[in-house]
Amino acid sequence: MNNRSSVLQVGNTSYTYYPVSAIEGHEKLPYSLTVLLENILRLAPNDEHAAKLADRLVQAGLSGEVGSEIEFSPARVLFQDFTGIPVFVDFAIMREACIELGGDPKNINPQVPCDLVIDHSVIADEAGCADALKNNMALEFGRNKERYEFLKWAQESFKNVRIVPPGVGICHQLNIERFAQVVMTREEDEKKVAYFDTLVGTDSHTPTANGIGVLGWGVGGIEAEAAALGQPITTLVPRVIGVKLTGKLSEEVSAMDVSLTFAQMLREEGVVGCFVECFGEGLNSLSATQRACISNMTPEYGSTCTLFPVDEKTLDYLRLTGRSEEHIALVEAYAKAQGFWNDPDSTQRVYSKVLEIDLSSVTRSVAGPSRPHDRIDVTRAKQAFDRICSERKLDTEKTVEVNILGETQELSHGALAIAAVTSCTTATDASMMLAAGVLARNAQAAGLHPKPWVKTILAPGSRATEDILDAAGLMPALRDLGFYTCGFGCMSCIGNSGPILPFMHEIANDIELASILSGNRNFEGRISPDVSQNYLCSPALVIAYSLVGTMDFDFETQPMGVREDGTEVFLRDIWPNASEVKELLDECCTKEVFDRAGEGLFEGDEAWRSLGKEASDVFAWDPESTYVRRAPYFDGMTKKPEAPKAIENARVLLNVGDFITTDHISPAGSIASDSPAARYLEDHGVTVQDFNTYGARRGNHEVMMRGAFANVKLTNKLAEGKKGGWTKDFLDGEIKAVYDAAKHYQEQQIPLVVLAGKMYGSGSSRDWAAKGPMLQGVRAVFAESFERIHRSNLIGMGILPLQFEEGENVQSLGLDGSEVITIASIDFSRGLPDPSVVDVVATKQDGSKVSFKAIVRIDTPTEGAYFYNGGILQYVLRSLS
């Protein structure tokens, strides 16, 4: 493998690159493994190591099975502010710890480009009015000034860091519009080196970039920290599922409908931990942004990525969004040289399994009421709603009266409290947003208007999206229906919906209210604590549902309203014409629009520019701060790690069921006034109206550890029927807040464990879903299965992930959570756990014992090294000190 590099001539420029063609069998690898192979060839420290890792990858890839451990070093890291601020807080703490261990604090600095976009903090406090955007931005800045000052310090004090100020857009949309290069270049030894653009991000929807041919995925903040500091990510060579796309979409169907179809099909298939990539002649009918919409939904079916190869559609998008012709020529030449150019057939590529989706069979869809993969055909949405009510034992005849502007209205289960056109999932694709605007214009012409109990929210993913709607002349119709832009950020998609209308809040416990949004997540309790049912769909359908004000509606048979002439209006009468949308797209979605939207990307408004923080090696902590505090992760840390010991006489903190999401474990939304976190804030002089959200408080471990397992919708079997963040304290027999019980156990030096079912840790790449439990004293989590990112996060924080053996679970073992649990010691000194299946003894209250074995889900030697060190940050800190 001597001379791993070669020269690629593009026009008058010569590029050094690392051809995968040097490796036998490369042409049969899936596209995604080709990217990993190039990464190995380029970054391995010597030929021997490169040959070893390349052989592992190729052997696994050609077998279609999971392979051995390889290393992956992403070209860059993407952050959003909720998960990014804790990262830079950790860096600040690590700098201090580095000094204490005798090292240079400047060693704690990102080694690769890092972009942080402030998109998670804006809340739809106001909506449906002309001043909503201005007022929400002012409120956002007022609440978050302290956090933003910290980010200004981070930008000045760390190299390789760029921060996009608030009010610009969503990180994933800006990533494909502005940051992603598809092929990157750098100067090295007076040569220009070309290589695949790759990334990891601290948001689970990072795979959005897969749609334009950029391999990347979501990781927890702690894993992203290590990657930013130059630590390779280790992973087993994954199984790769090929999705063959055939046919083309019918005119009324959107990319969101395809995304929901993917989520349903692939979650049923079971692709957790797999790579997914798309091929087939159906790709030719999908634009780059439609592909990005599909890729955005990746975490909702559990795969690591959903990659599309590069083709002319990719180049068209790069051209549209302002990349130079020289760079576009490089992308084309490099993709073709590396076998990454779209081959519609791809029959020679080896996949673990091939699934097929006929795009012409996709129908208009919604998904809900609490899982993105529970797809429903719109024509059967009314029947599905009736079934959901029956399953929940809801009286569909029940009504409640509300007074709206002097008129009495009767509402029943399924009444819409929120209709939100929001999220990078759909705003990325201009055709979907234009379709929503056309439907709004048609509805306006027919005399239709959203019901007065619906809070209407429009949150474009970037300034370009609003500019396109404006250029098409559709913003006036949207505003007339109450869809005023109220923020350029994630908003409802992450639960920043703000308060629902007061009279709706008053009846939230009497009937099950619903929300409808064009986002990617609808988990229980996520969109609003007052809303019990959440549904996902395309932007046009969001507006359509706002016009009828309920999920209890059949668009096929029920009229949405009556025109002035007495004729009935059905959805089919106002649905956008595909040819008109295409004309508007061609006319209004232009390079000039994207160029204007990209001007001053990093400058911010006057409020942002006025923030002043000088660079310094260490951060000056404010002891009075309730937003940014020094966490105790490294207190008492020694240069050499202590070997992990057996976990003896542990108590069960929670006993939960299937599909416990990271939202359940560490909520991002509002802080309940009766919660331990609220008590802490009030004790520190913070009034209820200034609580902000858990997500905004992630720089303060005191708030976040009190917020662990505090989701108001959490069901814990130990809480004796009490819903929310409650558990039983077996030391005194009381039902109390989870944090209060955990604190009591910690005072008695009693370790804690969690019992769970399938898919534990699904959802967001939330490192606080591991940090919070760790600070509460949780040492291990037992589950039937773990979602990929959360399992990594647990290891990264020194929590042991233990999986029940096949056919066993909490119920089959007869566990109820009252047991005292002992887990035998495990040796990690050689990397992989020894034993890989550990003995566990659960002692019941009557003294009887249940003995069983659990699989230690520490899958690679590197993960073992992290756990041996007490966590990934401790490992990295020791290596840099």
Model-predicted regions and their roles:
Residues 614-690:
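Segments forming glycine/polar-rich beta-alpha architectures that bind adenosine-containing cofactors
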Residues 279-286, 520, 743, 747-787:
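Extracellular/luminal Protease-associated
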Residues 45-248, 255-260, 364-367, 375, ...:
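Long, structured ligand/cofactor-binding scaffold of large enzymes
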Residues 563-578, 791-866:
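Acidic, glycine-rich flexible loop/linker segments
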Residues 1-76, 87, 115, 614-616, ...:
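Acidic/polar, glycine-rich intrinsically disordered N-terminal extensions of enzymes
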Residues 73, 91-146, 277-394, 557-620, ...:
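Terminal amphipathic helices with adjacent charged low-complexity linkers/tails
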Residues 188-335, 341, 432, 440-452, ...:
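Mobile "lid/hinge" segments at catalytic clefts and subdomain interfaces of large enzymes
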